[in-house]
Amino acid sequence: MINNEDFLDEIGDSHFSSNAKNPLREDAFDITDEEKIEKIKKDVENILQTLGMDLTDDSIKGTPNRVAKMFVKEIFGGLNPAKQPKASTFDNNYKYGEMLVEKNITVYSTCEHHLLPIIGRAHVAYISSGRVIGLSKMNRIVEYYAKRPQVQERLTMQIVQELQKALGTEDVACVIDAKHLCVNSRGIKDIESSTVTSEFGGKFKDPQTKREFLDYIKLDTQF
């Protein structure tokens, strides 16, 4: 019989979840961003003091506030649904019927297990069923879902599901190739490895269509 803490240590980097949503509490937005920053600032101060750091030193006395603002306003800003980009779509007046691929979208996210960076590229494609979306909106959707504590599998699914909803079609695909600093800089410390995840919907489940998409992106990510 192991306790819950031992269990969490045992599963380590194993990824499991009941759905594609981030695990947020119901009261996640009961306080303002400014209140969150103040609370996190005090928590970071406590961590640094516990580590023995001198918070009167000019180099780090502003660190708690910087970290708190970074968490709330920047790297975890995608947790706030008020910041979700508007996925405007338009009629496919050109009657373009082939797949559209947006390659090499920059991914900056954060591993929710160790709060270390995930850095990589996303490749997203869809086949229009009558609606099209602005190219930059695809980048913004990737950025929005990346700016939160994440696992790469969930991020890949969220991007596809958001585009499926916006475009009114199942014919959406996403591949992400990313480095996880929780693997590269700690633990096994394998600086060469990267993680590839994929999600294929609708016509992209067809082997020929999937092959066409993969040929377009020619996965060889440069980090």
Curated annotation (Swiss-Prot):
PROSITE patterns: GTP_CYCLOHYDROL_1_1, GTP_CYCLOHYDROL_1_2. Its EC number is 3.5.4.16. It catalyses: GTP + H2O = 7,8-dihydroneopterin 3'-triphosphate + formate + H(+). GO terms for biological process: one-carbon metabolic process; tetrahydrobiopterin biosynthetic process; tetrahydrofolate biosynthetic process. Zn(2+) binds at residues 111, 114, 182. It holds the Pfam family GTP_cyclohydroI. Pathway: Cofactor biosynthesis; 7,8-dihydroneopterin triphosphate biosynthesis; 7,8-dihydroneopterin triphosphate from GTP: step 1/1. GO terms for molecular function: GTP binding; GTP cyclohydrolase I activity; zinc ion binding. Belongs to the GTP cyclohydrolase I family. This is GTP cyclohydrolase 1. It comes from Flavobacterium johnsoniae (strain ATCC 17061 / DSM 2064 / JCM 8514 / BCRC 14874 / CCUG 350202 / NBRC 14942 / NCIMB 11054 / UW101). The gene is folE.
